[in-house]
From Swiss-Prot:
HAMAP family: Ribosomal_uL4_B (MF_01328_B). This is Large ribosomal subunit protein uL4. The keyword rRNA-binding applies. It comes from the Bacteria. Belongs to the universal ribosomal protein uL4 family. GO terms for biological process: translation. GO terms for cellular component: ribonucleoprotein complex; ribosome. One of the primary rRNA binding proteins, this protein initially binds near the 5'-end of the 23S rRNA. It is important during the early stages of 50S assembly. It makes multiple contacts with different domains of the 23S rRNA in the assembled 50S subunit and ribosome. Keywords: Ribonucleoprotein, Ribosomal protein, RNA-binding, rRNA-binding. Part of the 50S ribosomal subunit. GO terms for molecular function: rRNA binding; structural constituent of ribosome. InterPro entries: Ribosomal_uL4, Ribosomal_uL4-like, Ribosomal_uL4_dom_sf. It comes from Leptospira borgpetersenii serovar Hardjo-bovis (strain JB197).
Amino acid sequence: MKAQKYSKEGKLISEIELPSALFESKLSVASIYEAIKAENANLRSGNHATKTRSEVRGGGKKPWSQKGTGHARQGSTRAPHWVGGGTVHGPQKRDYSYKVSSKLKHKAVLSILNKKAQASAVKVIEDLDPKEYSTKSFDSIFKNMNLRNTGVIGFLVQGESDFVKKSVRNIPTVKYINSKRISCRDILYNRNLVITEAALNEMLTQYGATK
């Protein structure tokens, strides 16, 4: 599969062949589903909780006598049918985490890359090594690539680059992605995936080998 290659300024240079080990593996929708499901589940805190009648403060005294008042008998003001009472079958704290094997995630990443390449949504750019923070310069790069108003851009760079990360985070449609910590959500939920040459080589080392 082919992809467009851009200069550091965002100018189109040529069309290159993408590594087949990364972008031509067999598409597995099931693997993508399981990996995304696990990542979404792991983002949930699970700290929601309601109080039952035994946990709500107060209500120890019987509201009124059992007989002779004309009211229905009541044992506590914290019964579920009272205002301020406990909750029946309400949500309780739980662990939503869902684990998948590294082999499945590996397969999911390659499947997503394949899907992106088929949709011509993968762009390769020369390595960027800024020496200062500049949102304006990165905004200009994406404008030159004609990607600025096309939707979310996944910007995949090698390692943790503080200058790059802080420069692009003020651009609402750009998602910074560290090649050392790739998540399926990051590379899937975007309209275009822009990859630096160094990040592409690192991905080839990490995901290119058959598992």
